[in-house]
Curated annotation (Swiss-Prot):
Molecular function, one GO term: metal ion binding
UniProt GO BP: iron-sulfur cluster assembly
Binding site for [4Fe-4S] cluster 2: C176, C232, C380, C384
Protein name: Probable cytosolic Fe-S cluster assembly factor oxy-4
InterPro entries noted in UniProt: Cytosolic_Fe-S_CAF, Fe_hydrogenase, Fe_hydrogenase_lsu_C
Gene3D superfamilies: 3.40.50.1780, Fe-only Hydrogenase (Larger Subunit), Chain L, domain 3
Spans annotated as Disordered: 38-59
Organism whose genome encodes this protein: Caenorhabditis elegans
Function in brief: Component of the cytosolic iron-sulfur (Fe/S) protein assembly machinery. Required for maturation of extramitochondrial Fe/S proteins.
Keyword Phosphoprotein set for record: no
Length: 457
């Protein structure tokens, strides 16, 4: 991996027990997994010519062209080929999209902001302004916080759990694309029926921008460019899913995903690491302008979305109280119960981060020993704060030290609950599209071929 030829910031390297993507694509030369779309960027994989000159006349193959859609349909590796991720979704695509669109919007995750803040020694306020200034100088109209989209997800998760029969539990979070790919390709029949149907914040943000904002501004979705800055390379893969295209079109709701490290490299390259003067946009709505003013929204429950904590909160509110107890099983596993005064367990949720812990969970589920109601799952040890696209450091000690700082910065983010703005957008969206709620959910399906035999643990 270290000799891949890619910039150091775009490698998924040495993230503890995280399973890195396979560099050797196994899609056969003769077959196509997914029909290619003309507009998709492509990566050429050339094959060596046979030694036998005579046979080469009949056996020589054309270049194989692999897209992210191919990766999603193939079970050759857990996530995807790094080459494809980098070549298809890069800053070149961002510049092109901004130039060719009538409206450009960038969604930025608070995890990315805190990672950059730790790296350059600035506050999250300052970093938010730097990022907004950088993109607006490129021609982006709106730079928004993904926390606004996460609010839609939070409003739905307890309702989803409440309607999930106890026999179908645990309900598994779906915000981590690495885990979703693992579930689809390795344990489809067991895990897919239990995965939450609620979209991730990135996917919801794409729906808001292409499904709501575009309509409100009188634009076609194809005239709007939406990029996202995320802590995870697999978010690039998520954006390429067929489910996350504007209904009835080939237009992606999120056109391009850039990792935290890729963004910082580009900001430094353009010598734009200071917050510049951004024109006064006080007339803009709060959710469209807050990030540009340095406002970043955090959440109770840590940097991985706070889904488990939100369920506990809503359960306690609905049931008039309860005794909440949290146990740390290891540094990447947490269990929380809500008990009655008599000691009866009324609700049990868990946080499970890192593939080793995920595998232990799967083993328990196979033997029906897992009694948890809801599990917040992240593929990376440490969760989203330690995503594969975050700023990486040379030694493991330095990585752990910086991760603690990133988590602390996230914990210190204000819990601004702009309920009024959120309700206003939701109501306005419903007026434009009475079926808007459908855009907050998705479906997953197993990938038929099993890859257990090719995994190297």
């Amino acid at each position: 991996m270290e000799d891949s030829g890619f910039s150091g910031v775009v490698r998924l390297s040495n993230v503890s027990d995280f399973i890195a993507p396979n560099l050797d694509c196994i899609i056969p030369l003769e077959t196509r997994t997914v029909e290619k779309k003309k507009e998709e960027s492509q990566v050429n994989i050339r094959t060596k010519k046979p030694k036998d000159k005579e046979s080469s006349k009949t056996e020589e193959k054309k270049s194989v062209k692999i897209s992210l859609a191919d990766c999603l349909a193939c079970s050759g590796c857990i996530t995807s080929a790094e080459t494809v991720l980098v070549e298809e979704q890069s800053f070149g695509r961002v510049y092109e999209g901004i130039q060719n669109s009538k409206l450009s919007v960038v969604t930025v995750s608070p995890q990315a902001i805190t990672s950059i803040a730790v790296k350059i020694g600035k506050s999250t306020n300052e970093v938010a302004k730097i990022i907004a200034s950088f993109f607006r100088r490129l021609g982006v109209k709106y730079v928004i916080d993904s926390s606004f989209a996460r609010k839609f997800a939070h409003s739905l998760i307890y309702e989803e759990l409440s309607t999930t029969p106890s026999t179908s539990r645990p309900l598994l979070s779906s915000a981590c694309p690495g885990f979703v790919c693992y579930a689809e390709k390795s344990h489809g029949e067991l895990l897919i029926p239990k995965i939450s149907k609620i979209r991730s914040p990135q996917a919801i943000s794409g729906a808001i921008i292409k499904g709501f904002l575009a309509k409100r501004e009188g634009l076609s979705p194809c005239d709007v460019f939406h990029a996202a800055v995320m802590p995870c390379f697999d978010k690039k893969l998520e954006a390429s899913r067929e489910q996350f295209k504007v209904d009835g079109t080939d237009v992606r709701e999120t056109d391009c995903v850039i990792s935290t490290a890729e963004l910082l490299e580009e900001i430094i390259k353009l010598e734009n690491d200071e917050a510049g003067d951004v024109e006064n946009r006080s007339e803009e709505e709060q959710w469209l302008s807050a990030l540009s003013k340095g406002s970043v929204i955090g959440d109770d429950g840590g940097a991985s979305g706070g889904y488990a904590d939100r369920i506990v909160r809503d359960f306690v509110l609905e049931n008039g109280g309860g005794i909440v107890k949290t146990s740390k099983l290891n540094k990447n596993m947490f269990s929380t119960t809500v008990e009655s005064e008599a000691g009866e367990i009324l609700l049990r949720v868990a946080k499970v981060y890192g593939f080793r812990n995920v595998q232990n969970l799967v083993r328990k589920m196979k033997t029906k020993k897992e009694k948890t109601d809801y599990v917040e799952i992240m593929a990376c040890p440490g969760g989203c704060a330690n995503g594969g696209g975050q700023i990486r450091y040379e030694t493991m000690d330095e990585r752990e030290e910086k991760l603690i700082k990133v988590e602390a910065l996230y914990e210190d983010l204000p819990r601004q609950d702009d309920e009024e703005t959120w309700i206003k957008v939701r109501e306005e969206w419903e007026k434009l599209d009475k079926n808007y709620r459908n855009l907050l959910f998705t479906d997953y399906r197993p990938v038929e071929t099993n890859v257990a035999q090719v995994l190297k643990w």
